Amino acid sequence: SATAIRSGKKREFCDPSIAVAASGLNPEYYMTDLQSFGFIFENLCIRDLRAYSSKYDGKISYYHDRYNLEADCVLHLRDGKYALIEFKLGSSEIEEASSHLLEIKRLVKEYNKKGNAPSLREPDLLIVITGTEFAYRRPDGVFVIPIGCLRG
C-alpha cells in the first residue's frame, strides 16, 4: 500500500483488572512478568486518557506507518491538535520511547518537505506516560508524565 500512515481505533478492556482476573494469576505474578504487566499498564493508561479526554471530545487511536514505527496511542482533539504517546513502566525505557516519538515527528516533517499533498500536521505534543514519580520536559521537547499526574 502507498499509504504512509495508518491509524485505527485502540481496543482495550474497560477495566484492566478484568484481564488480570481472567488470567487466573495472582497480582504478584505480574511483578515477575514485566512484559505482561506492561500491557496491563498500557491498558490502564488508555482507559484513563479516554476518560479524562472525553470532557474535551478527545479521541484515542493508535499509529503505525509503513516503516514499522508505532506509537502506543494518539490523542486527537476536535481542533485538529494531536499528541503521540508511548507508555513505559520504568525510567529505563524512556529514552527508547522518546526516540520512537521523535522519529515519527521527523518522518512527518520529511514528508511535508517533499511537497506532498495533503501535508500532514506535525504532532503538537510528544508524551511518554510512565509508572515513575516525576514529570518533566526533556531537552528534546518530549514530556515525561507519570500516570498519577493524569487528571480530568
Model-identified regions with their sequence ranges:
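Accessory nucleic acid-recognition modules appended to NTPase machines
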Residues: 1-81
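Hydrophobic/aromatic beta-strand patches that form the interior of the parallel beta-sheet core
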Residues: 12, 61, 83-85, 127-129, ...
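Conserved nucleotide-binding/hydrolysis micro-motifs of P-loop NTPases
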Residues: 18, 67, 91, 133-135
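Switch/connector loops and helix/strand junctions flanking conserved nucleotide-binding motifs
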Residues: 21, 94-96, 135-139
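Active-site ExK catalytic segment of metal-dependent nucleases
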Residues: 76, 83-92
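Mg2+/Mn2+-dependent nuclease catalytic core
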Residues: 90-111
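Short mixed-charge
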Residues: 106-125
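Domain-level recognition of nuclease-like catalytic cores that cleave nucleotide substrates
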Residues: 129-152
